[in-house]
Every structure is written in structure tokens, then in C-alpha cells.
Amino acid sequence: MRHDPARLTFEIHDRDGDARRGTLHTPHGPVETPAFIPLATKGSVRGMSSREVAGIGYEMVLGNTYHLLVAPGPERIAEAGGLHAFMGWDQAIITDSGGFQVFSLAHGGVAEEIKGSGRRMYGLAKTLGIEEEGVRFRSYRDGSELMLSPEESMRVQAALGSDIALVFDECTPFHADREYTARSTERTHRWLRRCLDWHEANGPAGQAVFGIIQGGTHPDLRKESCEVISAAAVDGVSIGGTLGRNKEEMAEVLGYTVPNLPVQSPKHLLGIGEVDDLIRGIALGLDVFDCAVPTRLARHGMALAPLPDGRFRIDVRKPREAGNREPLVENCPCAACSGGYSRDYLNYISRSEQLTAVRLLVDHNLTYMERLMRGAREAISAGQYADYGERIMAGSAPWDAR
């Protein structure tokens, strides 16, 4: 592992079992961990201004290389002074490599991400070929052919000026067989070297690079990937690829992956953000999580809530919420709950498709996640993380579980 103070440092303050509280020091300020990272997929967190996201307490967001390559393009963002200046965000930014999106076009699963682009674009997005050089695909905006390679991914992320760039990898689906997964993992490792070579020669000063662990649900392939990434000149590790068909299999995959990673390295779990998954992931020693769950739920009229039997969510559009004068969650400090907006009102504006409903629900969900992680950090420092996790899983709100 590389430890270049000019790029990024990771300091561990407290431990409680395998859970740990720390700080990622980036060129744009500290990020307290464990941390949940909201998605600013196209340069904004859906429904929120950058100032509002920071006001909730977030210190880092994730930008999407694939979407920002398609539009508005890295050159336009670079001319604006980089993604920080472009979106008015002066704290840390991590960018993914674009690999998940282009491979989802081939393997399925990207449709949910690009729904906001309009129905007319669905048929345009298509992967044309996966080669050693990279991946050829069609833009979902205009059907033009684009190429994303390890070098191009790093070039785009350099132009965006993120604090942390992720290497280009192939994200295999669960249904890929072992033989394909093995070939894919080996290719990801070759692409890792190409990413690092490009970044070493051309990368912007201060930009850290995280490697990505692949290997599917195969313990030997995961172990091999951990060894390759751990030996490389990277600043941290992200765990990607399929984690199984259900939460039990995900726990199993993480259980034999995380112990094979360097203890001092910051560990990032890609694309996972359910409340119970975060609680379990922190207990395993993971530090950073990103996911579209808070904003995706809000778009569909759902709010996070301390309801383990209901997957920690409320559907405010349901008829039973009409006439309910209670807040989404008692004592929640979000704009919806603290602002006096009842479930009854949120039911009405959600069912009538008012933009205010999405904004209030996004604010609530992001606040809930931020307080969940804040509580986890405090519990780790107090040596009480197991108790905190049990209370969350039993139905306590984050602000009541400490």
C-alpha cells in the first residue's frame, strides 16, 4: 500500500472489536469515519443543493465518471475549475471509475440509474464490446460510440479533480460462472497496473487512488484479488463486484474478504447502503459506504425509519398515512420532521407528485443516514458499538440508540 501524505492519510482513533473510528485526511478536508457517502451522480445530490448536503453534516460525496463523461464532459468541468468548483462543493469528492455502469449495460442493471435521463434514451445505451483495451459503448443521450479504458477513466477522473479516484475494473454479475469471473478478475488486475501507470505519469497532485477488490463469490479469487490490490501502490481499497444473492451471502463474502486486507488501509464498500448492511459492515471493520438508497427511496415516496420489520422504511404514499398527523420519525432533526410536516401532508404531496415531497424526503433520508453514522462513531469511541448496533436492529432511531 502507498502512504503519500500529499494525497491522503487515514488515521484510526478508536477501535471496538473490528469496528474502528477514524479520519480520512483529504486535500479538501477531513472525512470522519465510518462514513456514508451520498451520490452526486451527475454533479449533484438529487433534490438537494451542495450547501444543503453539507449542512446535514456530510463531508464527502461521490461523482460518477460514466455519467459525467457522457454529459457535460470532463473538459467542460475542467474549464470550470474541476468538479468541486462546478458543483459548488468545497469538501471531499470521490469518483468511481465508470466500470460499474458500462458493465451493467452488458450484464443488466443500469436502467434504474439512468431513469432520470428520460424514456427515449433507454434504447440507446448499449455495450458494444468488452476488450483488453477497454469497453466500447453507446451514449444513452445520443447513441454516439464512446470508449472507456483504464487510461481514459483515469484521465476523466483527473479532469474532474476528485480527491479519490477509483481504478477501472470489470464488475461481474452474480450469474457469471467461475471461469468467467476468474478471467475478469485477472483482467481487472491488469487494468489496475495500467491505471496506476497512467496516474503516476499524468495524475494531478493530491489525487489519491483506491484499488478495487473483485472475485465474485469465490473465496480463492477474492483472496487473490486482496493480495494483488494490497501489494499495489494504492492509497486505499474498495470492495466491488457481486456480493451474492442475499444478505447472508453478502455477509459471507465480506467475512472472507475484509480479513485479507491491510488493517491500516481505509476500506470502502461500493454500492451498499441499507441500514442493517451498514451496521454489519461497520462491525467488520469497513470505513466508507456509498449507495443511492436515500435518494432512490425518496423518489419513490419512501422515508427511512426505525422499523426493522419493514426494511427500515415507510411508504408515505400508502393510504394509511393519509390523516396521520405524526412526523416521519419522532425527534428527527431533518427539515421534514423538525419543520412540522406531518405524514398526512407528505402523503398528499407525494401522491400529487410535488417536487417538495422529493426534497423533504431526500433531506430526511440523508439526515437519518448521517445520524446513523454519527452514532456509530460515538459508540465505537465509547466501546459500545455492539450495543448500539443491537438497538438499531431492534428498532431504535439513531438519536435514541446512543
What function would you assign to each model-found segment?
Residues 1, 186-189, 196-198, 202-328:
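Glycine-rich phosphate/ribose-binding loops and adjacent secondary-structure elements
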Residues 153, 184, 188-191, 195, ...:
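Alpha-helical packing segments of well-folded alpha/beta enzyme cores
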Residues 1-25, 31-35, 47, 168-175, ...:
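C-terminal extensions of enzymes
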